[in-house]
């Protein structure tokens, strides 16, 4: 069953909470909130203060993984520095999920192109993974996507 994705054109912390309520779900356990923390020198991310009401509402932990491309988040040390520079680690509990090797390998049954996916092994500590993403298309649009439980 495909996931539902909710959008809003009103870019405000209150709108994010309304999107969460529209999902009709209560996240439980250790709630992992995946978002874009921003690259060094780039202002194209929504600040910790923007996300504060949502993250506090679900008692969440901000989670990310190191990037596979050059930048300020491609090593754990650089990623932690970026999290500090952008205020994330001061505002919330943060978990860089692939900080410790090896990655967790998830099998994809009947995968046509990919048969396994490597993810940060801290994913197993999350009772409710969720993703908060921002998109640009004509205007800035914000979405909240509930990814569901993993096995």
Feature map (PLM): residue ranges:
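N-terminal and secondary-structure boundary signal
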Residues: 1-151
């Amino acid at each position: 069953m495909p996931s539902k994705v909710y959008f809003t054109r009103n870019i405000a912390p209150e709108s994010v909470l309304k999107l969460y309520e529209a999902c009709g779900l209560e996240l439980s356990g250790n709630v992992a909130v995946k978002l874009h923390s921003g690259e060094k020198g780039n202002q194209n991310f929504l600040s910790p203060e923007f996300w504060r009401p949502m993250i506090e509402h679900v008692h969440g932990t901000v989670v990310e993984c190191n990037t596979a491309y050059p930048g300020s988040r491609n090593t754990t040390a650089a990623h932690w520095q970026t999290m500090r520079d952008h205020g994330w680690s001061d505002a919330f509990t943060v978990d860089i999920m692939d900080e410790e090797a090896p990655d967790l390998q998830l099998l994809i049954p009947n995968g046509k192109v990919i048969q396994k996916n490597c993810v940060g092994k801290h994913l197993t500590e999350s009772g409710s993974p969720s993703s908060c993403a921002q998109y640009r298309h004509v205007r800035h649009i914000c979405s909240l996507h509930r990814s569901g439980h993993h096995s």
